[in-house]
Design a protein with these regions (language model features):
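Structural detector for internal amphipathic alpha-helices that build alpha-solenoid repeat scaffolds
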Residues: 1-7, 17, 25-40, 45, ...
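Conserved binding-pocket/active-site segment within a compact domain
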Residues: 130-134, 147-151, 155-157
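Amphipathic alpha-helical segments within extended alpha-helical solenoids and repeat-rich scaffolds
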Residues: 152, 193-199
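HEAT/HEAT-like alpha-solenoid repeats
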Residues: 87, 143-151, 183-190
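Short terminal alpha-helical segments
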Residues: 13-20
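Short coil/turn segments at helix-helix junctions and helix-capping linkers
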Residues: 115-116, 158-161, 195-196
Length: 213
């Protein structure tokens, strides 16, 4: 078991250094977990860099830390998104899905529709249903909501049942968050019920319909 000693005078700087200087996978995970737990904006660049590392444990801790920091993360992460590192992009998609910032709308739509990883498509579909529309003007929100509705309708026909399941969850969240779309989504779920063959997805559709009554 690795032990990480951190000076209390400036723990953020010390933990950033610990992340950068970690000489084992275990030390890296521990340092990232400790840094993420501080919930300090100064940690955003380092936590973003960790998403590029080939260390899933550290990446999960970084994702959790970035989500906890909320919308303050979005501008930096969008600007520094590594389009050539698939792993980093996949982890970043999970961050955006967890934060719910509509500034990441285009990225989430693209991920939900096109990403080759079912886990990324699933995360993006769930995230699309939980965007914070209050951050947009009414006109912007209406346009974005229509985009999300169309995207989730498409993703609800994905070849992988786990992605379809996530799309149903996304549609339910969208309906509960946007009253004007509730009837449309209810009818869409009714139509999807007639097309779905997977029992677990059918059960999720049924539960969503119950929540929208």
């Amino acid at each position: 078991m690795e032990v990480l000693t951190v000076p209390q005078s400036d723990p953020v700087t010390a933990l950033i250094a610990a992340v950068e200087q970690a000489d084992s996978a275990e030390k890296l995970v521990l340092a990232v977990q400790r840094l993420a737990a501080l919930r300090q904006p100064e940690a955003i660049p380092t936590l973003t860099t960790v998403l590029r590392y080939n260390n899933p444990g550290a990446a999960v801790a970084a994702v959790d830390g970035l989500i906890a920091l909320g919308e303050t993360v979005t501008p930096y992460l969008l600007e520094h998104l590594d389009g050539y590192n698939y792993g980093a992009r996949a982890w970043a998609t999970r961050v955006f899905a967890g934060i719910g910032d509509p500034r990441a709308l285009e990225l989430l739509i693209e991920a939900a529709q096109q990403d080759f990883s079912l886990s990324v498509r699933r995360a993006a579909a769930q995230g699309l249903g939980k965007l914070r529309w209050s951050a947009l003007s009414p006109e912007q929100a209406n346009l974005a909501q229509q985009q999300v509705l169309a995207t989730l309708g498409q993703v609800a026909l994905d070849g992988e049942w786990v992605v379809r399941y996530a799309a149903i969850a996304g549609l339910q969240s969208l309906a509960l968050g946007v009253t004007a779309l509730k009837l449309t989504i209810y009818q869409q779920l009714q139509a999807l019920k007639t097309q779905e063959s997977e029992a677990i997805v059918l059960a999720r559709i049924a539960w969503a319909l119950q929540q929208l009554v």
